[in-house]
Amino acid sequence: MTIRKNSGLVPINIQLYKTTPIQTILQAEQQDRFLQPAELSQLLSYMKSGVLRLEIAETLSRNSTNIVNAASNRIFVGGSPLSYLEKPEDSIDISSIDTKNTKFSFSNIFKNLFSNEDSIPAGFKPITIVKYGSNKMRKSLRDLDWFLRYLSYAIIIGDPNILAVNIKGLREIIENACSTAATIVALRTMKRTCIKLFSSNPEAESIVNQYFNVIIQEFEAPSLSDRIRKRNSADLQGLTLPQTYFLSSSTQFKYAMKPNLSVEEKNEIIRAAYRQVFERDIVKAYSLSLTKMESRVKIGQISMKEFIRALGKSSLYRKEFFDSFSNSRVVELAFRHFLGRGISSLEEFQKYFAIVSQEGLGGLVDTLINSKEYSDYFGEETVPYLRSLGEEAQECRNWGVQIKLFNYSARFQKKPQFITLFKDYQTPLPDQHPYGHSNDPLAIQFGAIFSKKTSTAFVNKDVRRILIYKGAPIENQLSRPLKLNAYKELNSYNLQIIKQSDNLTENIIRACYLRVFGRNPYTEEKLILQPIENQFRDKCISIKELIRALSKSNLFRKLYWTPFYVCKSIEYIHIRLLGRPTYGRKEINNYFNISAQGGFYKLIDAIIDSEEYSQVFGDNIIPYERYLTPYNLSLGTLRVSSIREKFKKLQPPVDKKFVELGRVKEIRSKNNIILKLNQGVSKRREQTVIFARHINNSQSSLEQIIKAAYRQVFERDIDPYTIGREFYSIETLFYAGSLSVKEFIEHLGQSELYRKEFFEPYPNTKVIELGTKHFLGRAPKDQGEIRLYNQILRSQGLKSFVKSLINSQEYIEIFGDSIVPYRRFPTLPAGTFPNTDILYKNLTKQKFFILMPSYKNTKLLSV
């Protein structure tokens, strides 16, 4: 059987009914405008009546049993009809039902009938429950309850369309099983019963009466005939559309140019023509229009048909839909614009392609507009419209591209869709896996992997995979395998059948682990599998049952079932237990059904208990790899084309001494040697001087420590600033040994001079950068550190910030009590070297930017 590509699948959900909001908004949307005051008023009245409609529906739902009971008692005699009503137990309140009237005699029936205001339908006779039968009674009570439910649905959505769609045509169906006259009597009884429930609310009574009248009228009306799609060629499909689909679908507003219309209405019709031909309102979007042709069609000099012809021949249409497209795509778009549909067949495409090739755009437009199809659908006055789903029956062939042609983005698609599809119809597909992405996928490419959303499956269940056997072959991939003993000599595969013995038991268990799990279990996993091993060692189970037990273990389930979707899991398990990939869709569908109905364990049993497993492996053979896909086989084969020539001449390396391997082969100059000696980090790290206080420091050494502290904290020598004797007292205490270097640094950081120089002029983020530079000898590490110190600054102030830096664990470990802080990262490697280097190279008083901002820089846009 030859398999060819199909047109793809675009799922379309049929609209089941109309609602007041949808119909109001849909008209404005199709006309590309805002809602008018009258439409807004209609929506407002619907919204205001929403509470009342919900109350009506709630009352009907609460009293539904009584309403159905009253209707059934009018038409059934000889028992209690309500007992045949199938409803959930909690939805029927028996105590609220008037049981006195559940049994009626013939005299009471006719007395009640003739006391009604409505006339009795001709041919009505009360129905005896015993003769009617319990099965028909249940169906009749179900139908009465169905009528009442749909009444509540229609009242809630505010449109009786759902009643017309679902009730029209039921008369013929009920006539074959029951009595039409009895149904009408029951509906009228339900109407009167419901109206009595709302006797105190005239508005609610009017709504219920209106919708019940629709139910009765639609039931009495004859069913409508199907809509026939007109066909003008023998190569086109004959199509019919049920009237219910047409009634429930969104109404396609049709515009017809009449002489007695107002100017505003004529302008709206002209704009509808623009939207159809140019796929947009060119007056609103681009302020373009064909003024001369508009005037002529308004005064009646030309018909709407000729106006459409003029639009198709205009320079704007040529520029938008002809010059930048191939002739194939021009024909497809012209069908959408002038006939409202897509191309039906290759013969139709060839006909119009020849016209556009010989006569150009004008000839194509004339042929389409002069066609009988155009005259039948649009005539002289109607603007063409899209004949989409619901408007008329759609062809099954070309479904995907047909629906895509109706999309707004169709004009942006340059590639012709229909002719490409017609070519694919005639090109057979090669054999491929039905779930694969390519023609010959890997054995591990599982599941429904499709290249396009609208082309979900190019193949059917008869397409099968290409498999290359490795070991015992089968004559036909679709037939059952032959027994292994039919092949005594297997040249392509050296098969060893391992039979159970005491010496080989452990080897068999390890081989089963490798085959089933793909690896040896871990120690803790083996403890869980120990009972299965013991059963096999005690010869209580065969190799087949050992494979079954391992496959049903939690370890196997965790490896090949839980992490994947069903199709992928089936492929994994199938390869592990049967030694080959699945043949095709028919086989994998069977396993999919087993998994859906019975679950994981049923799938394992179905594979191991299969006839193929029994004939190939039996009870004493461990499963092995039997089949491969061609691509998998090529991956595991060392091909000659992949082996370069130089690899064939490789000689084993000769061991050499380390000194010989490190010997310089080229001649190096003196400058080259100096350059290599000086490469790497600079000498700054080695040249760093650390000032520390010791017990035997001299007076001059203490002075150097004080000056180094000033330079580190204030970034300069502050001798000119000591005139005010601000630091005289702390210097005296430091010389006397009462203050350590750490305490001296802390006093400097908490001084008024430091506050004036490094706190007041800057934001908190800059203060934190300078603080870590002065007291820790580095830049801030990250945003987390900045947030921490920012919180301290904001809540406790500068002194607490300096104290937290100096008392930090980092300061104590690196500087202790006797070392003046210094630049800690003058060279690489260091995590904060780049920021520290920038921080030390910049002049603090000349550059105020923040090194590590917590937000990105933004540019002010000039207005």
Swiss-Prot record:
Per the record, the gene is apcE
Task: Specify the PBS-linker domain's residue ranges.
Answer: 235-414, 473-652, 671-852
Species source reads: Galdieria sulphuraria
* GO terms for cellular component: chloroplast thylakoid membrane; phycobilisome
| GO biological process, any | photosynthesis
**PROSITE patterns per record:** PBS_LINKER
Q: Which UniProt keywords apply?
A: Antenna complex, Bile pigment, Chloroplast, Chromophore, Electron transport, Lyase, Membrane, Photosynthesis, Phycobilisome, Plastid, Repeat, Thylakoid, Transport
Which GO terms label this protein's molecular function in UniProt?
lyase activity
Which compartment or compartments is the protein found in? Plastid, Chloroplast thylakoid membrane
**Its EC number(s):** 4.-.-.-
Protein name per Swiss-Prot or TrEMBL: Phycobiliprotein ApcE
Upper lineage ranks? Eukaryota, Rhodophyta, Bangiophyceae, Galdieriales, Galdieriaceae
Q: Tell me the function of this protein.
A: This protein is postulated to act both as terminal energy acceptor and as a linker polypeptide that stabilizes the phycobilisome architecture. May have intrinsic bilin lyase activity.
